[in-house]
Amino acid sequence: MKRSILALASGAFILGAAEFVMMGILPQTATAMHVSIPAAGHYISAYAIGVCVGTLILVFGRKVPPKHLIILFMAIALVGNTLSAVSFCSPMLLVARFISGLPHGAFFGTATLIAKTLADKGKEAQSVSMMVMGQTVANMLGVPAGTLLAEAMSWRLAFAILAAWALMTIVVVISWVPSIDPIKDAGIKGQFRFLTHPGPWLILLAVFFGNSGIFCWWSYVSPWLQKTGGWSATMVPMLMVLAGLGMVVGGI
């Protein structure tokens, strides 16, 4: 794997882990913030809202070199996860989670462009899949590791490690990812012209309903494994490894 793709995969790992780690540590977070588990689910929603809002960065940052955007996204992830680690009240954690979600969608769009551009001829798809593998690894290993840390030590440590990882990723992106030119500017209207065809709307609907179903299950996976399934808290990380493995197999 090229070092540049490895650097991008590192960023994908951070964002994948930051998105899903809250599912595994929801009970501990709810206790620390003195809220109910359903109310703590808003920390997951705040991240999702950040993802939606953050995609606008690509719309208004279309003239910025992609490498600079990746560095910006990792800096935002650094701030968001640092704030999550030190949050002392529920509103602060909500804001921190919103900030953490801002770079998510925009990162994958930009990283895909870079991965395709830097790939050897005929290996564009492989290059992109290797970049996305960072998020897959986060689902299978990163999230269970965060759950284990929360159970053994503190849920704050999971976010602190992600913040440190974001800082490291900024360094390797600066060092390993070459600069490429921004994509040809088609204007704001041009970026949405594809929506005049029915095909993209069908894809968007499929993604919407598919992700809605996954998040309905995944958001409260830790509480229902313990309270409904009867599993002990120490078994949750191992069960989440199996869930992550299922995602990997499903993706294949």
Task: Give the ranges of each region predicted by the language model.
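Extracytoplasmic
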Residues: S10-A40, T55, W217-S222
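Short hydrophobic/small-residue motifs within alpha-helical transmembrane segments
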Residues: Y47-I49, T136-V137, V241-L245
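Conserved MFS/SLC helix-loop-helix module at the cytosolic interface between two early adjacent transmembrane helices
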Residues: V53-P91
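Helix-loop-helix hairpin linking two adjacent transmembrane segments in secondary transporters
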Residues: S90-M92, K121-S175, Y220, W224
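Cytoplasmic helix-loop-helix junction between adjacent transmembrane helices
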Residues: A96-G134
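Juxtamembrane intracellular "pre-TM" segments in multi-pass secondary transporters
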Residues: W176-L204
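Extracytoplasmic gate region of multi-pass secondary transporters
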Residues: W201-M240
